[in-house]
Amino acid sequence: GVETQTRKLMTVCRMRKTPVIIFINKMDREGRDPFDLLDELEQELEIKVRPLSWPINQGAKFKGVYNIYEQKLDLFTPDKQRVTDKVEVDINSEELDKRVGEENAAKLREDLEIVDGVYPEFEVETYREAEVAPVFFGSALNNFGVQELLNCFVEIAPSPRPTKAEERDVNPEEPKFTGFIFKITANIDPNPRSCIAFCKVCSGKFQRNQPYLHVRQGKSLRFSSISRSE
């Protein structure tokens, strides 16, 4: 179900009209009906939802998801840590029956027909105005469905807004890199000096081992290790 911290976060997002994408996790375990989960999301988070992927069974019989946004079938293999097979397949084709079985294919077609009848057609502008939240299904433990959500996010998310600096506004279209650290997590492993700095990119492109000016300290710094979503 919806956790307490999620409700608090959504309250802030509604106040600021910040668009969100929802990931329904643990589809490789037995759980509630997807439609029941979507109803709970709309009631608890007070936002309209629109599925952009749909699970094919769940628990031990979980076969994967149909990526509605990309019109592709993403097949699931436990412990592979990735989508093991991505197939562009027509929802009414015999190929779908061969891939997931006739019973699962029939249920998927029935569910998608209900999805199209109940939920509004997805529009990017409606999402960017925080009026609807796209929903993806998957298994975070197996890293299944996560990359597909990130790919969609990169494509539909709004561009950064201009950010005020000390002397001027930073335009996100500028080629030169600018950014600010909004969070630092320390002591994440036994090494007492270890930390992760979370940086919002305001313009340009961040590259490793390049000198960057720390404005407050007036020092030039280099960073050899970065992590980002591909």
What does each model-found stretch correspond to?
Residues 1-230:
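Structural and coupling elements of P-loop NTPases
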